[in-house]
Swiss-Prot record:
Function summary: May play a role in DNA repair. It seems to be involved in an RecBC-independent recombinational process of DNA repair. It may act with RecF and RecO.
Segments forming C4-type zinc fingers: 57-72
Keyword Nucleotide-binding attributed: no
Protein name: Recombination protein RecR
Organism field: Hamiltonella defensa subsp. Acyrthosiphon pisum (strain 5AT)
InterPro entries associated with the record: DNA_Rcmb_RecR, Rcmb_RecR, Rcmb_RecR_Znf, TOPRIM_dom, TOPRIM_RecR
Key word Zinc-finger present: yes
Molecular function via GO: DNA binding; zinc ion binding
UniProt-listed PROSITE patterns: TOPRIM (PS50880)
Residue span(s) of domain Toprim: 81-176
Single GO biological process annotation from the record: DNA recombination
Keywords noted in UniProt: DNA damage, DNA recombination, DNA repair, Metal-binding, Zinc, Zinc-finger
Similarity section: Belongs to the RecR family.
Length: 202
C-alpha cells in the first residue's frame, strides 16, 4: 500500500524519538490519525510551545522557561552548599523523587567522549568551574551513568574540584554498570545517594 507523503513525513519525524523504529512510528502515526484528532492537535501545540519557549537555566543548564530554574532560585538549596552533577535533566527528576537531596544541580547535557569529539567545553565544564570558584560549595556529588565515558567524566570533574579544595563524592552501589540513572528505581537510587563515597586520587 502506497502511503501518503504527509503520513510518511509524520512517521519519519516520530522515528527521531528514542526507541521508536519504523513499525512503532507507523503505529503511532495511524493511532493519532484514527483517534480523536483534537488529541493530536493538542500534542502538536504542546510540542511547538515547548520547542519555542523552553531554554536552559543560566545556572545549572536544566530545561526551564525562566532565566533561572526554581531549584537554583531556592535560597535554602543554595545554603546547602552542595551541587549534584548529572548528565541529563531527566536525572534531576529521578533524584528529586528520592527526596534524599536538597542541594542544587549542574547538568552536563552529555559526557566526555574524545572519540566522538566531545570535550569539556561541549558539556559546560567551564561554567561548572566558574561556579566552583565563585560559590560557597562544600561538596560536589557525581551522579553520572556508570559507563566508561561517565567514569572518565566523573574523574575529570573530581580532579577539577580538588584544585578548589572542594570535596567530591560519588553515588554508591545499586546503579548497574552501563545503565541509565533515569531508569533506576526510586529506592535503589535513594540508597545510592545516601551511601555515596568520597573520591580520592592519592
Amino acid at each position: 500500500m502506497q502511503t501518503s507523503l504527509v503520513i510518511e513525513a509524520l512517521m519519519e519525524s516520530l522515528r527521531h524519538l528514542p526507541g521508536v523504529g519504523p513499525k512503532s512510528a507507523q503505529r503511532m502515526a495511524f493511532y493519532l490519525l484514527q483517534s480523536d484528532r483534537s488529541k493530536g492537535i493538542r500534542l502538536a501545540e504542546s510540542l511547538l510551545k515547548a520547542m519555542s519557549e523552553i531554554g536552559h537555566c543560566g545556572v545549572c543548564r536544566t530545561f526551564t522557561e525562566q532565566p533561572c530554574c526554581d531549584i537554583c532560585s531556592n535560597v535554602y538549596r543554595e545554603k546547602m552548599g552542595q551541587i549534584c552533577v548529572v548528565e541529563s535533566p531527566s536525572d534531576i527528576c529521578a533524584i528529586e523523587q528520592t527526596g534524599q537531596f536538597s542541594g542544587r544541580y549542574f547538568v552536563l547535557m552529555g559526557r566526555l567522549s574524545p572519540l566522538d569529539g566531545i570535550g569539556p567545553d561541549d558539556i559546560g565544564l567551564p561554567l561548572l568551574e566558574h561556579r566552583l570558584s565563585t560559590e560557597p560549595i562544600k561538596e560536589v556529588i557525581l551522579a553520572m551513568n556508570p559507563t566508561v565515558e561517565g567514569e572518565a567524566t566523573s574523574n575529570y570533574i573530581a580532579q577539577m574540584c580538588e584544585e578548589y579544595g572542594i570535596s567530591t563524592t560519588k553515588i554508591a552501589h545499586g546503579v548497574p554498570i552501563g545503565g541509565d540513572l533515569e531508569m533506576v528505581d526510586e529506592t535503589t537510587l535513594s540508597h545510592a545517594l545516601v551511601g555515596r563515597r568520597p573520591m580520592n586520587f592519592n
